[in-house]
Amino acid sequence: MNCISDFFTYETTKSVVVKSWTIGIINRVVQLLIISYFVGWVFLHEKAYQVRDTAIESSVVTKVKGSGLYANRVMDVSDYVTPPQGTSVFVIITKMIVTENQMQGFCPESEEKYRCVSDSQCGPERLPGGGILTGRCVNYSSVLRTCEIQGWCPTEVDTVETPIMMEAENFTIFIKNSIRFPLFNFEKGNLLPNLTARDMKTCRFHPDKDPFCPILRVGDVVKFAGQDFAKLARTGGVLGIKIGWVCDLDKAWDQCIPKYSFTRLDSVSEKSSVSPGYNFRFAKYYKMENGSEYRTLLKAFGIRFDVLVYGNAGKFNIIPTIISSVAAFTSVGVGTVLCDIILLNFLKGADQYKAKKFEEVNETTLKIAALTNPVYPSDQTTAEKQSTDSGAFSIGH
């Protein structure tokens, strides 16, 4: 019966005015902190009154310009940039190991790890190298024997030191970026309206002096990413050119501007002694008059650039404004909860506050009160009109 009786109960708030400087100051300070948080952080910094679009649509077109001297050859864009289509990911080759006149046939491996003394050491359990192992141990030189392979011969010797193309430091990268926020049908590009054809010939990007120039010098990008060009060109690496679009669409159209930043994306592999840097292989194929095919194999070291576009846009909307405002007003009540905890447990006179704060009224109490002090509806109406009592208890200290 007690469980049923407890279930069918009703609780209502009771207003108790506590005249205490201590608890009053705590209450106002907590309320001030909560209001300051919502006004300063939630509304002004996080712009909780806006609806945001994070599904940015973007396209990137790149173009590299410059010529360099490598191995007594003048190299232009067609020689050192891959892929040539001008995508958001491209490589500028800075060093190459060239193996010329390779033809299909049988030849000894060139790597030291394929050293052998007898055919038994060239079985299928050995890791494959530049071709398919034949199982024979043959002479590589007068002092070295290695396992024989079937494939493109002669095999590559990638341990030789080759120079780097230092002219690449002064190459330029032109970036054309277009973005769109579909929720607001807002479009813009990094080629700002005040940019002229003359500017395109002379300007170079600088975060302070010219932050909106779309032409970047390779050496500057490497420096802004905190890298050394000579070291990076020798081993290769991956750099990120990040373009950020964080736009407040409640402001003017020209206030939505790109922000460039630079970083090294493969910094983990940079510290590895097993496979530092970035390199890849490709081949150029030719045919002799008799129809035989041969090729030139190139192991290329270079700087890979990844143009990464990110961003979001916000605009005023009544729904998030109402939700955030309600959350702010509701959170002010946290001060009341904190003050109640202090009053009930820590302040002098806590027992008196508990007696006024929590009062239990049952049906028996109501019947006794009605018999001892009957109130008729007409008298009650008169009393309500003349009463100035707010219904609140006041506790003074």
UniProtKB/Swiss-Prot annotation:
Binding-site positions, Mg(2+): 111, 158
Organism of derivation: Homo sapiens
Glycosylation sites: 139, 170, 194, 290
Family annotation (Pfam families): P2X_receptor (PF00864)
Molecular-function annotations in GO: ATP binding; extracellularly ATP-gated monoatomic cation channel activity; metal ion binding; purinergic nucleotide receptor activity
Domain free text: Contains extracellular allosteric binding sites-distinct from the orthosteric binding site.
Keyword Nucleotidyltransferase carried by entry: no
UniProt effect for mutating residue 264 to A: Decreases sensitivity to the allosteric inhibitor AF-219
Impact noted for substituting residue 61 to R: Decreases sensitivity to the allosteric inhibitor AF-219
Mechanisms controlling activity: Has high sensitivity to ATP. Fast activation by external ATP. Exhibits rapid desensitization. Sensitives to the ATP agonist:alpha/beta-methylene-ATP. Subject to allosteric inhibition by AF-219. Mg(2+) and Ca(2+) slow deactivation of P2RX3.
PROSITE patterns recorded: P2X_RECEPTOR
Amino-acid positions noted as binding ATP in the UniProt annotation, renumbered to this chain: 63, 65, 172, 275, 279, 281, 299
Alphabetically ordered keywords of this record: ATP-binding, Calcium, Cell membrane, Disulfide bond, Glycoprotein, Ion channel, Ion transport, Ligand-gated ion channel, Magnesium, Membrane, Metal-binding, Nucleotide-binding, Receptor, Transmembrane, Transmembrane helix, Transport
Protein name: P2X purinoceptor 3
List of residues binding Ca(2+): 158
Disulfide partners: 107-153, 116-137, 122-147, 203-213, 247-256
GO biological process, one term: response to heat
Known role: Extracellular ATP-activated non-selective cation channel. Plays particularly important role in sensory neurons where its activation is critical for gustatory, nociceptive responses, visceral reflexes and sensory hypersensitization.
Transmembrane residue ranges: 21-43, 323-341
